Curated annotation (Swiss-Prot):
PANTHER family: MOLYBDENUM COFACTOR GUANYLYLTRANSFERASE. It comes from Aliivibrio fischeri (strain MJ11) (Vibrio fischeri). This is Molybdenum cofactor guanylyltransferase. The keyword Cell membrane does not apply. Monomer. GTP binds at L12, A13, G14, K25, N53, D70, D100.
């Protein structure tokens, strides 16, 4: 069975944050703390190999953890951050969470690890109703597939998941875990819920 300490983790903070008015979401305050700190708090209680994928504010993010940018230009989406994470991290298994989900459970890493089977390429969190495509654990062997996928201009993560041996980890006991704070309205709306 894959153990959490055999994995490394990347916080995805490389997007353009258009719905947040272009503000770097990792540094948007939620409950008096930057969203990047919420993400780090989630992971540091579960694992010790943590990095950040960002395409701006690199110096600021580097104060928190090792930080690297996408290797593909023009913000091709979270898949480019995942590609960079797989290339830059040392472990065979690399996990990913978004920087704007401050309510992820404190057993996220172990639940994803427990879903890994011998031939698994990717584990994706599933909340009982929907897959959560950017809360995932990937094996490095899929790097060539992601390279080809991004090179031909594909961006939809779900299509990549269909090309790989993808399994799902059950998070149905955590109905509010995957709330994303993408806009000022969502920050306000969910501030009291979390």
């Amino acid at each position: 069975m894959l153990q959490p300490k055999q994995t490394s983790w990347v916080i995805l903070a490389g997007g353009q944050a258009r719905r947040m008015g272009g503000k770097d979401k990792g540094f948007v305050l939620f409950q008096n703390k930057p969203l990047i700190e919420h993400a780090l708090d989630t992971l540091t209680s579960q694992t010790d190999q943590i990095a950040i994928n960002a395409n701006r504010s690199i110096e600021e993010y580097s104060r928190y953890a090792v930080t690297f940018s996408d290797q593909f230009s023009e913000y091709p989406g979270p898949l480019a951050g995942m590609h960079s994470g797989l290339v830059n991290m040392n472990s065979d298994w690399v996990g990913f969470i978004p920087c704007d989900s401050p309510n992820l459970p404190n057993n996220l890493v172990s639940l994803l690890c427990n879903a890994v089977k011998e031939d698994t390429d990717i584990v994706v969190a599933h909340d009982g109703e929907y897959m959560q495509p950017v809360v995932t654990l990937m094996h490095k062997r899929i790097i060539p597939k992601i390279d080809a996928f991004l090179t031909r201009g594909d961006r939809k993560i779900i299509l990549l998941y269909k090309e790989c041996n993808t399994v799902f980890a059950d998070f149905s006991d955590y109905p509010n875990a995957f709330i994303n704070l993408n806009s000022p309205q969502e920050l306000e709306q969910f501030g009291t819920l979390l």
